[in-house]
């Protein structure tokens, strides 16, 4: 696996938040294959005619 170093300028006191966002994005890309496998396993588990947006709206 490769390594990437990125240098960016961020507003004062935003370093921690920016680092966290970048690390979470990198973690997703490292685990995305597993995520999509899981989504395919779960596909069709709930038998409904509603879209995911309608189901989400019902939960709120």
Curated annotation (Swiss-Prot):
This is Uncharacterized protein AF_1714. It comes from Archaeoglobus fulgidus (strain ATCC 49558 / DSM 4304 / JCM 9628 / NBRC 100126 / VC-16).
